[in-house]
Structures are given as C-alpha cells and as structure tokens.
Curated annotation (Swiss-Prot):
Region of interest (Domain I), ranges: 1-63
Stretch list, region Domain II: 64-139
GO biological process entries: DNA recombination; DNA repair; SOS response
Homology family: Belongs to the RuvA family.
Taxonomic lineage from the root: Bacteria, Pseudomonadati, Campylobacterota, Epsilonproteobacteria, Campylobacterales
Region entry Domain III, spans: 139-183
Domains: entry comment: Has three domains with a flexible linker between the domains II and III and assumes an 'L' shape. Domain III is highly mobile and contacts RuvB.
Keywords: Cytoplasm, DNA damage, DNA recombination, DNA repair, DNA-binding
Gene Ontology MF, one: four-way junction DNA binding
Species in which this protein is naturally found: Helicobacter pylori (strain ATCC 700392 / 26695) (Campylobacter pylori)
Family annotation (HAMAP family): DNA_HJ_migration_RuvA
Protein name: Holliday junction branch migration complex subunit RuvA
Subunit structure: Homotetramer. Forms an RuvA(8)-RuvB(12)-Holliday junction (HJ) complex. HJ DNA is sandwiched between 2 RuvA tetramers; dsDNA enters through RuvA and exits via RuvB. An RuvB hexamer assembles on each DNA strand where it exits the tetramer. Each RuvB hexamer is contacted by two RuvA subunits (via domain III) on 2 adjacent RuvB subunits; this complex drives branch migration. In the full resolvosome a probable DNA-RuvA(4)-RuvB(12)-RuvC(2) complex forms which resolves the HJ.
Amino acid sequence: MIVGLIGVVEKISALEVHIEVQGVVYGVQVSMRTAALLEAGQKARLKILQVIKEDAHLLYGFLEEGEKILFERLLKINGVGGRIALAILSSFSPNEFESIIATKEVKRLQQVPGIGKKLADKIMVDLIGFFIQDENRPARNEVFLALESLGFKSAEINQVLKTLKPNLSIEAAIKEALQQLRS
C-alpha cells in the first residue's frame, strides 16, 4: 500500500499531478487547492490514500493530514465518491468545511459541483459530531474513523468520545472507547 510519495512534480493539471519518484511517474488525484500549491520541477511530499477498485487503482494526494482525514471520512458517506470529495476539498479548506457543517450552511455546500440538496443534507447529517471542538481534534477524528470502520454508528461514537479523557493517545482512546461500546 502506498501511503506517501516524495518526488519531483512533472506535470500539474486541475485535479491531477504527475510525480516522478526514482524513475517511476505516478498520476495522483489532488484537489485544486493542492494543485495550486505545487510547482512543476519542484520536489513535493504528498500523503497518499490508495483506493483499489475493480476497474481502477487510484492515488489521492494531500499536503496536509487534516485534508486526508476529511477526504477519507467523506468517502464513507453513501453517494460521495472521490470526484465529489475532491470537489469539496477544492472549494473549501478543512477549516472552512468544518465551519459550514457546524453552522449547517446547506446552501454553501450545494454550490460545490455535483452536490444537490439531497446529498448536501446527507453530508450534514453524517458529519454532525465528526468535527470535535478541542485541541485534541485530529486525534479524536482518527479515533472516530477507526471506530466507524469497525461498524459502530456515528451517534454511539459521539457519545463515547464525549466521555474520554482529553489527553489520551489515539491507541488508548480507541481501547477505552471499545470497552465502553462493548459494555
């Protein structure tokens, strides 16, 4: 599994960059925001999410871990694929998107190409509680994703996350949350 690439940017287009890594050129899907920050001929370091489908092997690249975490969470929403998730990240920074979800600005979300009222409402409902307002937010979001991947519902996870001690490591938080969820 590819989780990161460090190499020279060969080509940049709106939603894809080509990165040469020791003689191999990788096509990586990126948001327009990420593409705008990269320069052809310059070295780049991207965090990668590799998605393997029946008909395609896709690499999605991110400059920031927060973008990658948000992208992974968006992919878990029924009706949101890589194209729409990248459109969201192209339109809003993770902080802007968090604000849109927190203030329930459905109309702003509908401005993203490919998102209608129904999907915007679904995204709002599915992401309520995903963005936790504290200094441990990135760790909490990782715990949320881990528990969700184990099949727990968002509402259950949010209840348990509220009870966890704030300075737990990710591993300790997952362990404690699992104990609470299974009891």
